[in-house]
Amino acid sequence: MDESLLRFDKKQKYLVFDTETEGLNLIRSRPWQVAWLVVEGGKILEKHDMFLDWPNLDVSAGAAKITGFTMEEYNKRKESPRKVWEKFSKHLYDEDTFIVGQNLLGFDVYMVNIWRELMKLEADYSYVERIIDTRALAVAIAKDIPVDKDDFISWQYRLINHRERKLKTSQAFLLKKYNI
């Protein structure tokens, strides 16, 4: 077994996150929920599930159905986007932390930028080079595609855009397949 693999580095820190949004528009849909874990050595150091308070939030019927969104729950739990950002961004921009998630490169990085824009912050994608997108990894495993270690981020972008009928890469499928 290759001891240099990330999974053997018990001091490596990971930020695992996901956003829920008003819809699928990569330019305008606002993230209304962000959930994240900070993990080191197999131990969860932090666990958050926070709602962002935006005026006139308009979650599409499809997004509400998929995410279980209700305005009642949202109104109970919503917090200042800046307050949530302060907690979240310290991990996102920590250069010693790898960032992990399903389809982060295809969706969530855009939602993070919308969040920043709504708070009048400049775009900052400096964290993207540290992303490990589990959708890209799932495609690579399913199709037996070797990793491009020299240009890992471009390799992941190519794979998240791979489309093939009956190729299963959802988190639910992967968790079941690998008994996680």
Role assignments for model-derived ranges:
Residues 1-119, 125, 165-179:
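Conserved non-catalytic scaffold segment of RNase H-like nuclease domains
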Residues 131-162:
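Short alpha-helix plus adjacent loop in nuclease-associated cores
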Residues 96-97, 104, 117, 130-142:
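Internal, conserved structured core segments that host functional sites
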